[in-house]
């Protein structure tokens, strides 16, 4: 469709190099989004370009792409390890040696701002607690070094303990302390038990195995939408830090493709003009995350953002993609 005319039989192509400028694919259910991505990944595999697919919803990629030779699938159900789907294991507190601890800490708190409803002093309390958790694990926040000489990192359980300390030392009213404790501690504690306790661990997958190979991360069995968003955000954060550390002078060429399916789980549309401190904070954090994705093109990273409706995504996400592939949409978006 061009200049209000339909040109039938036209072949339209896109060079793999264009993917470094990022791509947005949208269309309603059954319009061909997944098949379009399959074709992109097929061409990437032919050219030996590694890729990472993060799928939070239907679990189709593990069946369609996960069975290709050389593709590794990570999931969230330990029972599926016998079927060749390895357990996803992430350490949110680990960061590359070239990254300063305070850089990582700021980005980590921004991810929480996107994924959890945060208001009033909650982000400041969480950040203070995370800082204290790192210090208790032996980290010097200025030098970005561990006094024990080893890469020892805190856990969510450590952060829970520190939140209680921060609140006890604060001058908030009893009601506010109760609200903050109920909101922050309950969410953080939920990440230390059950399946979440198996996912968020110090015994995590090496970055090279996640970001330098052909990988599917299937989150379709995760029940909580907040946890899905958190895992997606942490993977993007770790990818950004890993690419920055491995950056070379010849980063103009495509080195890796990341596919974000159902991207609104992480990059949801939240106007920064909305009334309410929480909405305003989420909007700013989403925009910051979208800008981080846009900047990764300088590392040879190409993002493919996929969603059913453009209206669900923050406008900065769509604005930062060079190629738009628009399939059938039920309404004007």
PLM feature segments, named:
Residues 10, 18-23, 212-215:
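Pre-Walker A (Motif I) flank of P-loop NTPase domains
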Residues 41-294, 298-301:
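P-loop NTPase motor domains
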Residues 70-72, 316-328:
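A short helix-turn-beta junction within AAA+ P-loop NTPase domains corresponding to the substrate/partner-engaging
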Residues 60-63, 308-316:
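Short, glycine/polar-rich helix-capping loops at beta-to-alpha or helix-loop-helix junctions
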Residues 36:
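Hydrophobic positions on the alpha1 helix immediately C-terminal to the Walker A/P-loop
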Residues 33:
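Conserved lysine of the Walker
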